Amino acid sequence: CKIHYMKKVFISGISGYIAMHCAQQLLEKGYSINATVRDTKKIDPIKKALKDLSLDVSKIDFFEADLLSDQNWEDAMTGCEDVLHVASPYPLAQPKDENDLIKPAVEGTERVVSLALKQNVRKIVLTSSVAAISSGHTKKQFSEEDWSKVDEPIPAYPKSKALAEKKAWDLINKSNKKTKLTVINPAGVIGPSLTSEVSSTQLIISGLVNGKIPINLPIHIGYVDVRDVALAHVKALESTKSDGERIILSNTELWTKDVSKILRENGYNAPRFSASVAN
């Protein structure tokens, strides 16, 4: 069942790498957007990037809002039929205190989903990650039925994604509202950035090229193009078939040495030597 177009969608954290592509695709389809930014200095670069794609930025209303504060969230969501909750902190390094990452992720999700339920929005699409699915396990294959083991000593990022996503499902399942939830769980996200924002996976690839990662690390992950991730968000909004679903997005998994080989085949300098995996 397809849903009609031309309505207003709320996007949290529009300046982010994935969120910008979501905004592009929604504007191309004629949607209007209410968007949050944590820092208003990002508004002009966002507008410029979207104008450069010949998009009508007058269809975006911006609101300053922080994941850890109630201020402006309700105003930002008013009049929106659907919600894309994309904003979530991600680390460039493991934080000293895991709660620096977990608290804004969980509280931000609780804030957005609770408000969406209060305002009776039709649908929420939440950006999660395969990190919410696979961390802490010894097995090799995963499905949407799996959850990262948050009671095990796993890194802060997968714990933050799993706990935030669980909070969203708990709120939806305990509610008597008709609001539907779909969760998108992408693997390592790569592809062009519309602003200076990048993903942690992109940093690995750029590190292989610029010498900051001089040897192939024993990292084995799946990859997915950011434009496909954004498309999945839009399609989830427009189809009732995705209601109540978690959706993993991943292409073939690759070791870092395989990524380096692809880079070298395309004219880039990338490491030829690999670190061994400890037994």
Give, region by region, the residue ranges found by the protein language model.
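Mid/C-terminal beta-alpha module of Rossmann-like enzyme folds, strongest
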Residues: Y223, A230-N279
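A conserved pocket-lining segment of Rossmann-fold NAD(P)-dependent short-chain dehydrogenase/reductase
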Residues: Q94, K149-I154, T195-S196, Q202-V224
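N-terminal Rossmann NAD(P)H-binding glycine-rich loop of SDR-like oxidoreductase domains
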Residues: V9-Y31, T36
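NAD(P)H-binding glycine-rich loop region in Rossmannoid oxidoreductase-like domains
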Residues: T40-K41, L50-E107
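Active-site Tyr-X1-5-Lys
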Residues: E152-L181
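Conserved Rossmann-fold NAD(P)-dependent oxidoreductase catalytic core, especially the SDR/UDP-sugar
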Residues: H85, P89, P95-Y157
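Glycine/proline-rich active-site loop of Rossmann-fold NAD(P)-dependent oxidoreductases
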Residues: K177-T179, G191-I204, A236-I247
